[in-house]
Amino acid sequence: MTTRAALGLALLLAACGGGAKELLETAQFEELQRNTTHAQQLYRTIVAKHPGTPQAATAAERLRALDAAG
């Protein structure tokens, strides 16, 4: 999957109220592609829209790690 396709998927999921699992998978893919800005946006969306889920806990952990890495 290309970065453009992943971005399109992420936008589609966000527009459709994508589930936490799908958003997390997309954020992790973006992070692997070194698109950390977009990954952080997706992680923040997960934390805000899906609080209390395991995916939100993972997203919060990744945000802390990315913030610490600068």
Residue positions per predicted region:
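Bacterial signal peptide processing site
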Residues: 16-20
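Conserved small-residue packing positions in alpha-helical repeats and bundles
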Residues: 27, 61-64
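Short solvent-exposed coil/turn linkers within tandem alpha-helical repeat scaffolds
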Residues: 47-58
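Alpha-helical linker/edge segments of TPR/alpha-solenoid repeat scaffolds
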Residues: 64-70
